[in-house]
Design a protein with these regions (language model features):
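ABC family nucleotide-binding domain
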Residues: 2-211
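Conserved beta-strand-loop-alpha-helix hinge in the C-terminal portion
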Residues: 207, 215-233
Length: 233
């Protein structure tokens, strides 16, 4: 059994008299430690998939298996525990607490889980060893995003879920952030899932899940993912 599996997953929304199908019979599998890109245009349903995998939303039908457990059967309390213990989130905007230092922002993880990584070492791992005591306003956009990644991985999550993580960053800074995410997968064993509309990022992934019109249109496996250093986008 794969580490993550979505099987015949559907998500529907009701808007007035209109039913919107956000996910239509979604099927895919992801292995532990892979860097996966979910690729598609706006409205393709990829963020809905990410929200369901992260326990921030629930599907209406089908299975969502994480490490052998079907989280689609979880109640609200079980989903909260799952989000707290097993999932790290990185978004396009950094969501840092402005009156806490970089180190204090990452230390928030230790208030959520019992086996959190050391905040200082985690920030060193993302290249911010000299910025531990800086506040978010004193950091560049790329540095703030690295703090948000450090905060997410400090929880030791089963899944690191990233929604357009470089969407607000310049080219060079975006590559630095992608390098960190690729290293988390390759060297730390993290299972990293990135949602993006940017098809140029596909070569860095172990697996690319293409979405179109609320469904998975194709899946490709890269036997030799491209190193970030050589990526042009």
């Amino acid at each position: 059994m794969a580490y993550i599996e979505m099987k015949h997953s559907y998500k529907r929304y009701q808007t007035g008299y209109t039913e919107i199908i956000a996910n239509n019979d979604i099927n895919f599998a992801i292995e532990k430690g892979e860097l996966v890109i979910i690729l598609g245009a706006s409205g393709a349903g990829k963020s809905t998939v990410l929200n369901i995998l992260g326990g921030m939303d629930t599907n209406d039908e089908g299975q969502v298996l994480i490490d052998g457990v079907d989280i689609a059967k979880y109640n609200a309390k079980e989903l909260t525990t799952y989000r707290r213990n097993d999932v790290g989130f990185v978004f396009q905007f950094y969501n840092l607490v402005p009156n806490l230092t970089a180190k204090e922002n990452v230390e928030l993880a230790s208030e959520i889980v019992s086996d959190a990584r050391d905040a200082k070492q985690t920030l060193i791992d993302v290249g911010l060893g000299k910025r531990l005591n800086n506040f978010p306003a004193q950091l560049s956009g790329g540095e703030q995003q690295r703090v948000s990644i450090a905060r997410a991985v400090a929880k030791n999550p089963k899944l690191l879920l990233c929604d357009e993580p470089i969407g607000a960053l310049d080219y060079q800074t975006g590559k630095q952030v992608l390098k960190i995410l690729q290293d988390m997968s390759r060297h730390k064993g993290s299972t990293v899932i990135i949602v993006t509309h940017n098809s140029a990022l596909a070569p860095i992934a172990d697996r690319v899940i293409h979405m179109h019109d609320a469904t998975v249109s194709s899946i490709e496996v890269n036997e030799h993912p491209q190193d970030i250093e050589t990526l042009e986008y």
